[in-house]
Design a protein with these regions (language model features):
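S-adenosylmethionine/decaboxylated-SAM
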Residues: 1-174
């Protein structure tokens, strides 16, 4: 599962990984973004170049409003880079994730939320999102630290600081 598709860059990596997988389980990629994304070429490639085809489904809604019951091996999170969003995403998606949670931009937005870096209006975002302003101003690092403290079944597997940062959490209870 990928949430925060935008320009579909990471979606291609997810699709290639599934196409190369030797697993005998059905191959399934779920894509999500709050805005509609152009994935037509990716859908065509998933049908034509993979045998059996990778099943790709998508929903263009706020990921916190998704109604998902089936688990995923991995979730890639690249959405709104603020404490409040990631805290809620981890609470929602960790129970649905069998192996890995991967998060992007965890270095560039580690201490301060992307709202500050991008010069957005935090007061307006607090009103539109319903998140407290301090959860918008704070970065991703605190959400990850709190999650790991509260969930001993998850560990920090990798933390890359180049290219804006990539953090990998691994489930260790099964």
């Amino acid at each position: 599962m990928e949430t925060g598709v935008r320009g579909c860059i990471s979606s291609w990596a997810c699709l290639c990984g599934l196409m190369d997988s030797i697993s005998d389980r059905p191959k399934y990629l779920f894509l999500n973004d709050i805005d509609t994304c152009d994935i037509d070429e990716l859908l065509e490639c998933s049908r034509r170049l993979s045998s059996p085809p990778v099943q790709v489904e998508y929903q263009w809604i706020n990921n916190l409003e998704l109604d998902i019951a089936e688990p995923f091996d991995m979730i890639f999170i690249d959405t709104w880079h603020i404490y409040g969003q990631l805290k809620r995403e981890l609470a929602k998606f960790a129970p649905l994730t069998r192996k890995y949670i991967i998060m992007h931009d965890t270095t560039v937005d580690e201490f301060q939320g992307e709202t500050i870096r991008s010069g957005f209006d935090a007061d307006a975002q607090a009103i539109s999102s319903g998140f407290p302003k301090h959860e918008i101003m704070c970065g991703l690092g605190m959400a990850i630290s709190e999650f790991l403290e509260q969930h001993p079944e998850w560990i920090l597997k990798e933390k890359y600081t180049n290219n804006n940062g990539l953090t990998v959490l691994q489930r260790i209870d099964g």
